[in-house]
Amino acid sequence: MAMQYDVKSVHMSASGVAVGYRTRLKGVLMSPSESQTLNVAFCDNISVSGTYDVPGSTVCTVTIANHGLSNGDRVYLNFTSGSSSDNTFTVSNVATSTFTVAVASATTNGNVTMYADILVELDCSSTTAFYTMIPGEGILAEQGIYVGLPSATVTTTLFYG
């Protein structure tokens, strides 16, 4: 196999679309600046929108029609209104148009965008930067790559091509 010369990189310091077209995720450099446990999600850039409600508890009910999830699935939720914090969550209590996730205790509701196709989820818990190489040809991202950064205390550089 010949050397691949078309690998590119992009640096992300906030959640958003890193690459807006079909590509392969080749590697990730994580650079946390604080010692706290964070989950960073690298998702296929396919999202669906819905609403959420946290009625004074730690249970967040998300309503998205025909979401296609099962109990135990992992999703990245971007809360676009209200006061819940964006993060990666484990899905439970799945019904046709609803599911729940565990969140910090709150009373809030609003709109949410869900990324259900997580390509890679990386955890960091110290201030030591680290690189994760994706073996083989990388992971195919059919619609591009969305990066979910749950805090401003971690940045990332993606390598793709």
Give the ranges of each region predicted by the language model.
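Small/polar beta-strand repeat architecture
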Residues: 48-117
